[in-house]
């Protein structure tokens, strides 16, 4: 099914025209929804600290999670105390839930588990991001909130909108769901503060981001503190349950890994030991960091993951920090006046 969807969205398959009436209906629904917030019929909650929303206008992976991790580290380096809120995709969360270090993907979602494992950032997940943001401030006293994948969640007021787009796939056929991959029209890019192009080339007004691979590490938790080595010249099985698995496989080939088999899975898909053991047979299994957080409890000794770090320009850092400081100063003045 996913292969057919990709053909419709990214390869000009004629079935897109049959789905176009549904896309028109989707366009009306999204327009009305935005209008309700713009007219004040539906309320938007303004937080006492700056809110940075990281999202995209397409369905599927574009590099949001590495961008969130990059922002966490950037803000910390410049004296901020950031926290993160997220929906916790695929997890039925009643109310809100704090993401503790070591939390499983089944409890909080794979991306929140990965973000906290990597950064130990204060993080709260919940279906209502406003409730999650309030809990984050009350429990941790953060001074900046990063909202992971909340561009279309208009109930949460935002001060800075950052959209990540896939430099390889772009906006696909440019059509709204379900005929195309767009959650909102391309016009939405004109309304955001920052556009990050994952992989480039960046168009005018965009900032190029590259994902730099780190060292290969064992998935099995009790191996991470010991000595280990990985021979990239040996044949291996590669797997990826992300929005664009092909991108991961292409990156591995470019780095010289010998891929005997590549297996893509649906984004956020859960795994079990038997499934992956049968996939790998006796070969090493190499996966993404996001996949690894779902496999730690049953990982084999020859299962590995490759993490990536986002790289952005100093110009991006300077402009984002300048904008954030402006917002923070205005918020302090406004809320001090209210008190």
UniProtKB/Swiss-Prot annotation:
InterPro entries: LpxK, P-loop_NTPase. GO terms for molecular function: ATP binding; tetraacyldisaccharide 4'-kinase activity. Keywords: ATP-binding, Kinase, Lipid A biosynthesis, Lipid biosynthesis, Lipid metabolism, Nucleotide-binding, Transferase. Its EC number is 2.7.1.130. It catalyses: a lipid A disaccharide + ATP = a lipid IVA + ADP + H(+). It comes from the Bacteria. ATP binds at residues 58-65. Pathway: Glycolipid biosynthesis; lipid IV(A) biosynthesis; lipid IV(A) from (3R)-3-hydroxytetradecanoyl-[acyl-carrier-protein] and UDP-N-acetyl-alpha-D-glucosamine: step 6/6. Pfam families: LpxK (PF02606). GO terms for cellular component: plasma membrane. One of its GO terms (biological process) is lipid A biosynthetic process. HAMAP family: LpxK (MF_00409). Belongs to the LpxK family. Transfers the gamma-phosphate of ATP to the 4'-position of a tetraacyldisaccharide 1-phosphate intermediate (termed DS-1-P) to form tetraacyldisaccharide 1,4'-bis-phosphate (lipid IVA). This is Tetraacyldisaccharide 4'-kinase. The lineage of its organism: Bacteria, Pseudomonadati, Pseudomonadota, Gammaproteobacteria, Alteromonadales. The gene is lpxK.
């Amino acid at each position: 099914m996913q292969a057919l969807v990709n053909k419709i969205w990214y390869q000009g398959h004629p079935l897109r025209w049959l789905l176009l009436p549904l896309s028109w209906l989707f366009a009306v629904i999204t327009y009305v929804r935005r209008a309700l917030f713009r007219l004040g019929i539906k309320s938007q909650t303004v937080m006492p600290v700056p809110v940075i929303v990281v999202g995209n206008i397409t369905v599927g992976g574009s590099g949001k999670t590495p961008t969130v991790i990059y922002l966490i580290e950037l803000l910390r380096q410049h004296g901020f105390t950031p926290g993160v809120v997220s929906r916790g995709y695929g997890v039925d969360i009643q109310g809100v839930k704090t993401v503790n270090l070591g939390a499983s993907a089944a409890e909080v979602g794979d991306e929140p588990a990965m973000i906290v494992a990597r950064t130990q950032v204060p993080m709260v997940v919940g279906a209502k991001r406003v409730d999650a943001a309030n809990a984050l401030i009350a429990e941790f006293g953060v001074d900046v909130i990063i909202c992971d994948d909340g561009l279309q969640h208009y109930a949460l007021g935002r001060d800075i909108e950052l959209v990540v787009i896939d430099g390889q796939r772009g906006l696909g056929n440019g059509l709204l769901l379900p005929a195309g991959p767009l959650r909102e029209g391309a016009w939405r890019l004109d309304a955001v503060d920052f556009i990050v192009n994952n992989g480039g080339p960046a168009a005018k007004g965009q900032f190029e981001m590259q994902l730099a691979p780190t060292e290969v590490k064992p998935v099995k938790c009790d191996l991470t503190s010991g000595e280990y080595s990985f021979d990239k010249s040996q044949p291996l099985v590669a797997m990826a349950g992300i929005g664009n698995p092909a991108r991961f496989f292409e990156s591995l080939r470019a780095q010289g890994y010998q891929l005997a088999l590549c297996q893509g899975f649906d984004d956020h898909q859960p795994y079990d030991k038997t499934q992956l053991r049968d996939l790998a047979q006796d070969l090493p299994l190499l996966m993404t960091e996001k996949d690894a957080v779902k496999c730690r409890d049953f990982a084999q000794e020859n299962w590995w993951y490759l993490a990536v770090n986002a790289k952005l320009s100093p110009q991006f850092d300077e402009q984002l920090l300048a904008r954030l400081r402006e917002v923070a100063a205005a918020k302090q003045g406004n809320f001090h006046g209210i008190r």
